[in-house]
UniProtKB/Swiss-Prot annotation:
UniProt keyword Cell membrane present: no
Keywords: Ribonucleoprotein, Ribosomal protein, RNA-binding, rRNA-binding
Taxonomic superkingdom: Bacteria
UniProt key word rRNA-binding: yes
Domain S5 DRBM: 10-73
Name listed for the protein in its UniProt record: Small ribosomal subunit protein uS5
The protein's assembly and partners: Part of the 30S ribosomal subunit. Contacts proteins S4 and S8.
Protein role: With S4 and S12 plays an important role in translational accuracy. Located at the back of the 30S subunit body where it stabilizes the conformation of the head with respect to the body.
Homology family: Belongs to the universal ribosomal protein uS5 family.
């Protein structure tokens, strides 16, 4: 499902390619949409969508959009900081940190995002719609909203020990 390439230090993953149709008076005009994920494997990850009459053109547009749309994720080593819930449309995702050696336990589109971000140990589940675009969006929302204890402590004016109890 996910095609992987290495380019300029970034991991590029092809998550989905769909054929779409525009209906006109003379029939249907087919084009392709591509959904890609790009990451450096060290906390920076982005996703993009591209649309074109040919598959390779759609993929290159999607990769370019993904490189422009990168975010930085606060990771705790090779896992997440804390459990995260997020949703986009009818897709809901739940991700929780896992101990070393667990691996990436996640389905399809979520797996591509987490691996590109550099998360090596995580337990994740997708509920509701499994539409790849919505799952990727929900996963991004969850990763973007995740905060480290250091940032929470700084925001509250407390020490990390007081935050973690």
């Amino acid at each position: 499902m996910a095609k992987v390439e290495q380019n300029e230090g970034l991991v590029e993953k092809l998550v989905a390619v769909d054929r779409v149709a525009k209906v006109v008076k003379g029939g249907r005009i087919f084009s392709f949409t591509a959904l890609t994920v790009v990451g450096d494997g060290n906390g920076r990850v982005g996703f993009g969508r591209g649309k074109a009459r040919e598959v390779p053109a759609a993929i290159s547009k999607a990769l370019e959009a993904a490189r422009r749309n990168m975010i930085t994720v606060d990771l705790a080593g090779t896992t997440l900081q804390h459990p995260v819930n997020a949703r986009h449309g009818a897709s809901r995702v739940y991700m929780q940190p896992a101990s070393e050696g667990t691996g990436v336990i996640a389905g399809g589109a979520m797996r591509a995002v987490l691996e590109a971000a550099g998360v090596h140990n995580v337990l994740a589940k997708c509920y509701g719609s499994t539409n790849a675009a919505n799952v990727v969006n929900a996963t991004f929302k969850g990763l973007r909203d995740m905060t480290s204890p250091e940032k929470v402590a700084a925001k509250r004016g407390l020490s990390v020990e007081q935050i973690q109890g």
